[in-house]
Design a protein with these regions (language model features):
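Structural preference for beta-strand elements that scaffold enzyme active sites
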Residues: 17-19, 44-48, 69-75, 126-127
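Active-site beta-loop-alpha junctions enriched in small/polar residues
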Residues: 23-25, 50-52, 75-81
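CE4/NodB-like, metal-dependent polysaccharide N-deacetylase domain
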Residues: 106-127
Length: 127
């Protein structure tokens, strides 16, 4: 994590921690490469993992080497189908959410599948 001085508005300055998180790990090999390089350069603190991606299991194999420098989270995906599942656009998902029409059981099932994929590949829960 990077520490930067706080803005000085006449008060004593204190250090603040800046956490930089890259979204969509496993979306595409180039995204993964950028996350890995930035982590090794000390410029990235965390990433969210897209476990619905067909590249997820392969990409996940490289993550243990980046620990503990890189915190890992789950990217709860409702909009990227990756050609494997039907997926609505973000606008449709937002509209359904506002209308209360997403369906609790379907959301729990999607969450559980994605969390299980994360834990199965990495042997740990998200940070």
């Amino acid at each position: 994590m990077n520490t930067v001085p706080a803005r000085n508005n006449g008060e004593k300055a204190s250090a603040r921690t800046v956490v930089l998180c890259a979204d969509d790990y496993a979306l595409h090999p180039l995204v993964d490469e950028a996350v890995e390089q930035l982590t090794l350069q000390g410029r990235l603190s965390a990433t969210s993992c897209m476990t619905t991606s067909p590249h997820w299991r392969q990409a996940a194999r490289r993550l243990p080497a980046l620990r503990p420098r890189l915190s890992l989270g789950l990217h709860f995906n409702l909009t990227e189908g990756h050609g494997l599942q039907p997926a609505a656009g973000i606008g449709a998902v937002i509209a359904r959410a506002y209308a209360g029409a997403l369906g609790g059981a379907a959301m729990r099932d999607a969450w559980r599948r994605q969390l299980d994929a994360f834990e199965d590949a990495l042997g740990m829960a998200p940070d």
